[in-house]
UniProtKB/Swiss-Prot annotation:
Matches recorded under Gene3D superfamilies: 3.30.70.330
Role description: One of the early assembly proteins it binds 23S rRNA. One of the proteins that surrounds the polypeptide exit tunnel on the outside of the ribosome. Forms the main docking site for trigger factor binding to the ribosome.
Species this protein is from: Acaryochloris marina (strain MBIC 11017)
UniProt-listed InterPro entries: Nucleotide-bd_a/b_plait_sf, Ribosomal_uL23-like, Ribosomal_uL23/eL15/eS24_sf, Ribosomal_uL23_CS
Description of how the protein assembles with itself and partners: Part of the 50S ribosomal subunit. Contacts protein L29, and trigger factor when it is bound to the ribosome.
Any one GO MF annotation of this record: structural constituent of ribosome
Protein name as catalogued: Large ribosomal subunit protein uL23
GO cellular component terms, A-Z: ribonucleoprotein complex; ribosome
Pfam families for this protein: Ribosomal_L23
Length: 100
């Protein structure tokens, strides 16, 4: 396992994923994040616990496939990314939607 410095922990977690399915998972205290494709589960756990000051009980990851994208006559593709579903201990929550 590679050594992770605190400055690189924030670079592992790219953004929270807010979809209908991810919103339903919030009821089970599960949060979905887009992470660096090279990140491992222990690195993701350390990053989430450090950034949000919570206790992680489980992580499942999946590599999302590359999808073709067509713009006019040109065919390109969307970048591949890794999705991590993080389960927190019952007493912890992450505030993804701060009050305005």
């Amino acid at each position: 396992m590679t050594k992770v410095t605190p400055t690189s922990l924030a670079d592992l977690i790219r953004r929270p994923i807010v979809t209908e399915k991810a919103t339903l998972l919030l009821e089970n205290n599960q949060y979905v994040f887009e992470v660096d494709p090279r990140a491992t589960k222990p690195q993701i756990k350390a990053a989430i616990e450090e950034l949000f000051e919570v206790k992680v009980t489980g992580i499942s990851t999946s590599n999302m496939p590359i999808k073709k994208k067509r713009i006019g006559k040109f065919i390109g593709h969307k970048a591949q990314y890794k999705r991590a579903t993080v389960t927190l201990a019952p007493e912890f929550t992450i505030n993804l939607f701060p009050e305005v």
